[in-house]
Amino acid sequence: MTKIILLHHLGLGDHLITNGMVREYCKMHDRVAIFSYPKNYTSVSFMFRDIPNLEVIPGDEAFALLFMFNNKFRRKYDETKNVGLPHLDIFDSEPMEKQFYRLAGLDFAKKWESFRVERDRSREQALFDKMKPKGDYIFLHDDAARGLAIDRKKVPADHAVVSPASGLTDNIFDFCSLIEKAKEIHLIESSFMYLVDLLPYTNPEQKLVIHRYARPNPVWSLPALKKNWEIID
């Protein structure tokens, strides 16, 4: 087996999309290295803390490309694999996420089949207690500061709203209990949407809503989702 550098898009949502990919590569290789924006490092390293042969290297795309270039001379890794731009075809009818997995040489079903994160229930409970939702509540995530705001008229007014405000935690997985216990989930297309869709939990009465109008995306980059979402365009 070999040592490989795997580069994919570095958004936190992209890390969730490629969780299954990374885990499959760690089965196939002796050593795997991936990259993470420093701001996402806590979440990414937490998500993969159960994999001993994975190295998460903090750095942006420019750092990652330079690291991969320098590896040609240092030969610390036997192989490099880039499954993101410039290898994606935005004019292809194949969705972006499927292209990721095809470029990685993996069945797209591995996105869900191989997804895994070891939850820390004590951390989740600490955040749940800190936010103290009472009764039925809505978990809502948007980004009004960037102009990606959910129209509150499209959200039921008879429930409290809980949102992941900045400064609460630097680990997205601390929100898992708040997510799974919510009466409704209202999201823009973001890392939280991917977390909700990929996270295995049981709440059959929970309503899932994506407010797509708040963050429109090209058709080729629309998410591939498994759960029963209502989409508001």
Label each residue range with its predicted role:
Residues 1-233:
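Catalytic machinery of carbohydrate-active enzymes
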